[in-house]
């Protein structure tokens, strides 16, 4: 086949190995059978996109309808490390990282569990994962929440519920904790209380925020409970190298330290209890080993925590992963919400993008497992009932509790 490349050069492409790879789309959930030949599917005058790999082998490509956004931040300083607003700036100036506000889906759950842990619940608390019907006046209907698997798992510890992203337990947890108390707590991360829904659907991430804000709020977990203000620009210099702008938010502290010749001793302020931050992060680290984020194991690092997110009908998917040095969140979906397909989840769409980004830079990121804060103890428990383990118990493990 003869094609015209982006440099207006006419080249010949061997397409004999491509035909077997082409399947026409029927809908978001189905593909047709392999085409028999190019001429049976394409016509003269059709515009076909090709792309080549490093070996100059060509394959059929598409200009995607689906979009994505990525925000990467240093959770200690707030410096933005990377920001991607979409597939192509030339085709769309819309910055999805900043302007889009897709629903969070299950990526919201760590915030709810943090509220629970700071209000009397703990990772060993048992909540029954069983069918339940809520009559919610704000939803104006009876609501029967379901897990993504369609199954129910019986009495479940909150640790297991978060790392396996169980919907039913999460909704029951919010119902027990209370919507008003939860909304008050969420303002500590930066959520606007009056914008949050007044119904139980908030438990499953019915609220939408930008990927940029999601990265900012998640940084509280990565930063040991402390909130940061993101910074885009550190300094600007002119063509002659003269500094014409410098971010001065830490300038007075730095100058004073230089004058007195030693670091200032500052009282740290926390948005949330550092013990809560540690416990949530510990659960999300475990989620990367045996939960919904286990594909992270490909990095061969155990200091990263992560949480997937999938909204109702798979209209938006998320993955947020972090350690103390870097936090990156990825959103994946359409500008005008519609289903990505029944088999698409945060683990199959957003997580691979996160992983591709991290694989390029992971060797430069310092190994940084979270430090256990004061007044947090580990106790051996019976994993079936969450109670202190007895000498005769077989199914046991350690869990963290506030001292």
What residue spans do the PLM features occupy?
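Short active-site loop at a secondary-structure junction
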Residues: 30-39, 63-68, 91-111, 124-130, ...
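Mid-domain, small-residue-enriched loop/turn segments at the edges of structured enzyme/sensor domains
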Residues: 140-146, 178-216
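A penicillin-recognizing enzyme superfamily signal
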Residues: 2-72, 83, 90-93, 164, ...
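Short acidic, glycine/proline-rich loop/turn micro-motifs
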Residues: 92-97, 140, 197-200, 339-343
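Active-site SXXK
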Residues: 77-78, 101-129, 161, 217-221, ...
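Conserved catalytic neighborhood of penicillin-recognizing serine enzymes
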Residues: 76, 121-180, 227, 240-279, ...
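Proteins synthesized as precursors that undergo proteolytic processing into mature forms
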Residues: 41, 89, 117, 124, ...
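Extracytoplasmic/secreted proteins, especially bacterial periplasmic and envelope-associated proteins
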Residues: 103, 111, 115, 122, ...
């Amino acid at each position: 086949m003869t094609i015209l490349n982006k440099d207006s050069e006419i080249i010949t492409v061997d397409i004999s190995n491509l035909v077997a790879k082409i399947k026409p789309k029927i809908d978001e959930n189905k593909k047709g059978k392999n085409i028999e030949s190019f001429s049976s599917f394409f016509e003269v005058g059709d515009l076909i996109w090709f792309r080549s790999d490093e070996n100059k082998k060509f394959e059929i490509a598409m200009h995607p309808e689906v979009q994505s956004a990525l925000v990467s931040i240093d959770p200690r300083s707030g410096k933005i490390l990377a920001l991607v607003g979409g597939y192509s700036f030339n085709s769309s100036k819309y910055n999805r990282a900043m302007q889009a506000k897709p629903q969070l889906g299950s990526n919201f759950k760590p915030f709810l569990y943090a509220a629970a842990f700071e209000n009397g619940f703990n990772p060993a608390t048992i909540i029954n994962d069983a069918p339940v019907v809520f009559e919610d006046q704000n939803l104006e209907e009876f609501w029967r929440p379901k897990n993504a698997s369609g199954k129910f798992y019986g009495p479940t510890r909150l640790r297991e519920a978060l790392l396996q992203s169980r919907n039913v337990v999460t909704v029951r947890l919010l119902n027990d904790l209370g919507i008003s108390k939860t909304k008050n707590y969420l303002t500590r991360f930066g959520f606007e209380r009056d914008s949050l829904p007044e119904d139980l659907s908030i438990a499953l991430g019915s609220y939408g925020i930008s990927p940029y804000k999601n990265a900012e709020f998640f940084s509280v977990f990565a930063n040991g409970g402390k909130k940061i203000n993101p910074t885009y620009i550190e300094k600007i210099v002119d063509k002659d190298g003269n500094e014409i702008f410098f971010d001065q938010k830490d300038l007075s502290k730095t100058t004073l330290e230089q004058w007195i010749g030693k670091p200032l001793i500052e009282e740290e302020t926390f948005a949330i209890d550092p013990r809560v931050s540690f416990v949530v992060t510990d659960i999300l680290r475990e989620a990367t080993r045996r939960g919904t984020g286990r594909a992270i194991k490909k990095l061969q690092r155990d200091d990263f925590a992560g949480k997937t997110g999938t909204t109702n009908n798979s209209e938006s998917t998320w993955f947020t992963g972090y350690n103390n040095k870097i936090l990156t969140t990825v959103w994946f979906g359409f500008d005008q919400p519609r289903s990505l397909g029944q088999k698409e989840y945060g683990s199959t769409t957003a997580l691979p993008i996160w992983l591709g980004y991290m694989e390029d830079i992971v060797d430069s990121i310092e190994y940084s497992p979270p430090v256990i804060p004061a007044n947090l103890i580990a106790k051996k428990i019976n994993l079936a009932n969450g109670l202190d383990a007895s000498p005769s118990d077989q199914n046991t493990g350690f869990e963290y509790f506030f001292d």
